[in-house]
């Protein structure tokens, strides 16, 4: 979303903040990987990055976050998790930023944008996982897609649908963003 005090330096600082959050939030659930899989902690800062800074920044931060986190901390594992997450989160950031810049900044449109970004990201994740499985000689059945993209992540999906619009609304009221 475009802000009145938008500047290249401010955008870089905010992008770095969202990237740092994508590194740190998974550490909250790091001791129990199943909880991390359920809550999807890296998704929150990337979706917010797209909403706040726009599609190009959301795409870049979303793509970089899981790959850099894998290299620096060893989690998520690079193949196939971090690679597929890079494409998924890039789609989250790009779609949320691109759509939000083209709609009225109302609560219903925030939800519509968020839902579209979440669906697009999950579809991209499934497509990349399918391709990576084929390249490695394994399979990625539709049941695995449903389990990974939907059933396991229900708590994270609900949390995103509740928290992201609240955060965006709070940032608007504080005039941090338009």
Regions of interest found by a model, annotated:
Residues 1-52, 56-57, 92-101, 164, 168:
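Hydrophobic transmembrane alpha-helices
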